[in-house]
């Protein structure tokens, strides 16, 4: 674990100081009369999915335990609404001793606009995903391809840290490289398991385009749009169009 992430690990209830946001950007409370309905859908949806998918999750857990050492569930500190840190859950898809410095450098270069330097001009390289990543286990590749690795985040939804639909929750070190306009995606609404950018292009979307789609969702969000995104997510997952 890097030193830069340690403060967030020690106290996951303390938000980022307001003066940490540059150029006067400040969190704004989420507004809208649909918030209560959205929360109800989150609780009912996440709870129902956990029950329905419990056998699949058990199979995934057994496969992880049988093929590699380490915890079954990967825990990582992410930033939620208003920059508040929380513990984010996924099924572990990497070797337990995997070094995160590779991903850190990739993400920092991506956000800083140095994509060509690391992708050799391939603008369609999967966002946040390193192609043929040697850190990923054989079982992990299947979990990622089918998006099964994301299922533990349903617990985050029940806990109120995430929503079924919303922007992707960033890692703390990513935000250090955000431009001011990028920050809105983590300030105003809860992060989600799926969102507009995931169903629009999944992992093939560029970073700036991802942020634009997140902001578009924030402007236009309503229950009908959430339901549409959820239905499209089912279609995308059934196509196994997840990360490689």
PLM features: residue spans?
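N-terminal hydrophobic signal-anchor/signal peptide
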Residues: 1-53, 111, 116-119, 244
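Hydrophobic structural segments characteristic of membrane proteins
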Residues: 1-23, 127-130, 134, 140-244
